[in-house]
Regions:
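Short tight loops/turns at secondary-structure junctions
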Residues: 23-50, 62-65
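Intrinsic-disorder/low-complexity signature in envelope-associated proteins
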Residues: 1-7, 34, 40
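Solvent-exposed, polar/charged alpha-helical surfaces in well-ordered, non-transmembrane soluble domains
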Residues: 4, 8-12, 56, 60-63
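Short, positively biased Gly/Pro-containing turn/loop motifs at secondary-structure boundaries
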Residues: 15-23, 59-93
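Short amphipathic alpha-helical segments
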Residues: 1-2, 50, 54
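Long, acidic/polar E/Q/S-rich protein-interaction regions used at subunit-assembly interfaces
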Residues: 18, 42-43, 47, 56-57
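An alpha-helix initiation/capping motif
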Residues: 4, 25-29, 80
Length: 93
């Protein structure tokens, strides 16, 4: 699906912030944005995780992922609005 491709691109650009790792910060900021028909992102906002570095990384992930692939013609919309949680979880060792 188009959503699956978008999610895969976003996830491929994820880097757990070093400072957050050191502080053992976890969270799930939500990114809210619109993808225009040509794949360009607009109206990007963040619902905070409570940790500034995680929120900044979530924003960076969207910006570096843009532009996304064009919205397929089969999707009869000029834009798609998405809300996606970005989960930052440290693995237990």
């Amino acid at each position: 699906t188009y959503y699956g491709k978008v999610r895969q691109i976003i996830d491929s650009n994820k880097k757990y912030p070093l400072l957050s790792r050191q502080r053992k910060e976890e969270g799930a900021p939500k990114v809210i944005f619109t993808i225009l028909k040509n794949g360009v992102v607009t109206n990007l906002s963040i619902i905070s995780s409570g940790h500034r570095s995680l929120d900044r990384e979530a924003r960076r992930m969207i910006l570096i992922s843009s532009p996304f692939p064009k919205i397929p013609d089969s999707v009869n919309e000029s834009s798609i609005s998405l809300t996606i949680p970005i989960n930052f979880r440290l693995k237990n060792n």
